[in-house]
């Protein structure tokens, strides 16, 4: 068997003929030519037999490694004039538009990025992280289910931080599938407006319920004409409990600042170490943390009252209570919090009273962001695993290829290219 024939079978790329093979010190260079007589625009479906000029464009792509050798595919491409996109270098069937990697290589990297950290990927495939990010963006652009916004009846909208410094992504999930179906940079009304704009009025009107946090931005967007005006707004109990936890943290900080002014600085340091004992659920406490809580209870004061309020609010949603029971307990909590004299909890009570209907709707319909929050926890793991991103688009792409509706097909799982 000739070397060119062997490499043709090993490459398993469609629409090419191998014309030359060059074994170099650290890589194998395979020169190919396209078999098709028609030139295809890389941006659209337009094709033509006519060349724009006789100039050839030398191009190369990184392919899957051949053992320890890098494998590079080279070809001289032709140029065409597309009526829509103007003069372009012809597209190739084995690589995505604008890429210097073959589709097989990118599909492998895209799958690896869902399971491995940055350092491991760089070592295995021998490309820098910025290149990995751009590969993932291309995999997302071509691999996401094009019908992911169809039959979207119950969804959740939430924001997640992708980088320190108030850098956020808004993510929309389908509660029925447990997958992210849309995402964009930002967390304001205009960001969610973009989602409804892409969804269109007809599909937006089909949404029956949408869960979100208790901020005003997402609700304002959902209630705009042409958006989800008929959907029931459900304020997620997770965020209600989170509001109580954040209020407790504000009280703790205030008390800690007061203790720092005392002559005994050791007391302030010991008190600062009580943070996790206060924030964790009672069932998750260590023995030392339980002992810390007992000391705080004996001491009493604002901090213990704040902790008791936080736990009272958490307990309302810890069980499977009916809507009327939750409503009664929320009213009781709000009354207690309003009389507490603790400003952060007074604010929480005001917010709950204002959002009461949406909170109870979430309980009544069983619609909440619990599954979405589970996705958000996985998002944070993804972000930590990647050690940062060069752009919001890169972060969003990795999130979507990992947690979105995409079917990863590895090169060996794809149907083999038939020999000519």
Task: Describe each PLM feature range.
Residues 28-38, 69-76:
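Short, flexible, mixed-charge glycine/proline-rich loop motifs
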């Amino acid at each position: 068997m000739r070397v060119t024939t062997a490499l043709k079978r090993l490459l398993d790329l469609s629409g090419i003929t191998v014309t030359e093979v060059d074994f170099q010190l650290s890589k194998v260079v395979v020169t190919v030519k396209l078999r098709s007589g028609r030139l295809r625009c890389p941006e659209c479906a337009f094709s033509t037999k006519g060349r724009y000029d006789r100039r050839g464009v030398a191009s190369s792509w990184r392919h899957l490694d051949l053992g320890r050798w890098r494998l590079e595919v080279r070809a001289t491409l032709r140029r065409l004039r597309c009526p829509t996109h103007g003069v372009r270098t012809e597209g190739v069937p084995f690589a995505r538009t604008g890429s210097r990697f073959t589709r097989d290589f990118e599909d492998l990297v895209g799958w690896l990025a869902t399971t491995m950290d940055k350092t491991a990927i760089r070592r295995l495939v021998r490309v820098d992280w910025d290149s990995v990010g751009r590969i993932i963006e291309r995999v997302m652009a071509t691999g996401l289910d094009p019908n992911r916004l169809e039959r979207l009846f119950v969804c959740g909208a939430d924001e997640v931080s992708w980088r320190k410094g108030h850098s956020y992504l808004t993510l929309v999930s389908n509660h029925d599938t447990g997958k992210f179906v849309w995402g964009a940079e930002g967390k304001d009304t205009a960001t969610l407006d973009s989602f409804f704009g892409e969804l269109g009025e007809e599909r937006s009107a089909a949404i029956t319920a949408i869960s979100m946090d208790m901020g005003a931005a997402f609700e304002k967007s959902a209630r705009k004409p042409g958006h989800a005006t008929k959907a029931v707004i459900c304020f997620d109990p997770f965020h209600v409990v989170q509001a109580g936890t954040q209020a407790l943290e504000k009280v703790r900080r205030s008390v800690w600042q007061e203790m720092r002014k005392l002559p005994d600085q050791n007391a302030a340091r010991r008190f600062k170490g009580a943070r996790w004992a206060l924030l964790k659920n009672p069932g998750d406490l260590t023995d030392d943390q339980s002992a810390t809580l007992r000391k705080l209870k004996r001491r009493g004061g604002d901090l213990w009252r704040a902790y008791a309020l936080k736990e009272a609010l958490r307990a309302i949603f810890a069980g499977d209570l009916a809507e009327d029971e939750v409503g009664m307990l929320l009213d009781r909590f709000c009354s207690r919090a309003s009389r507490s004299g603790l400003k952060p909890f007074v604010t929480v009570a005001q917010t709950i009273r204002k959002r009461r209907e949406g909170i109870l709707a979430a309980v009544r319909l069983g619609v909440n962001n619990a599954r979405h929050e589970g996705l958000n926890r996985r998002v944070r793991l993804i972000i930590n695993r990647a050690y940062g991103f060069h752009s919001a688009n890169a972060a969003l792409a990795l999130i979507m290829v990992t947690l979105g509706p995409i079917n990863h097909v590895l090169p060996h799982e794809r149907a083999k290219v038939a020999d000519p």
